[in-house]
Amino acid sequence: DELGLEFDDVGITGYPEGHPFISDATLAEHMQKKAPHATYLATQLCYDADTILEWIARIRDERDVDLPVQIGVPGVMNYAKLLSISREVGVGDSLKFLQKTQGIVDFIKQFIGSRGKYTPDDLVEGLAPHYDDERYNIGGLHMYTFNQVPDTESWRTDMLAKHR
C-alpha cells in the first residue's frame, strides 16, 4: 500500500532443461520454498514440447508444485540470432535441437524454405493437445521476442487465425 501498487500475481521461474550453473537439487529446493508464495510459474525458453511436458509432470509428481505454468516460447527470429541467444542463456544444446527438428536434410530444407527464420509452430502445436489438461495446468505462453516483436506478432496473428 505504501507504494500505491498492488501485486496481484507473482511468478517464479522454472527450467525444463535445467540451469547451466545451478544444480537440479538446488532448483528443486528453491522452487518448493517459493511456490507457496507464487501465483504462477514461468519457464525459461525451451524448444521441445516433450521436454516441457515431461518437466511439468515431474514438478507435479516430485515437487508437488501445482502452479499454472506460463511456457517460455522463443519468438520468430533468424536462426543465427536464435543460436546465439540460446548459447548465451544456456538453453540445451541449441545446434542439436535445430538439427534434430527433422533431421539434417529436412533441417536444411526448412532453413531455406523459412528464409532462415525460426517459427515456434512445432512447439506450440506439440503443446496444444495439453492446454486444457488439468494435470499440466498450462496458464499460457510467454513469448520471448528478443526485440523481434513485429515478426512474432505477425506469426501469432496468423497462428490464431489458422486455428479458429
Regions of interest found by a model, annotated:
Residues 21-36:
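Active-site glycine-rich loop that binds ribose-phosphate moieties when present
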Residues 1-2, 21-25, 45-61, 148-158:
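Active-site-adjacent beta->alpha loops and helix N-cap segments on the catalytic face
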Residues 34-37, 71, 141:
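Conserved, mostly hydrophobic/aromatic
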Residues 1-20, 62-132, 147, 159-164:
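Active-site pocket-lining/capping segments in soluble small-molecule metabolic enzymes
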Residues 133-140:
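Flexible, glycine/charged-enriched surface loops at secondary-structure junctions
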Residues 39-49, 114-115, 142-144:
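Catalytic beta/alpha-barrel core
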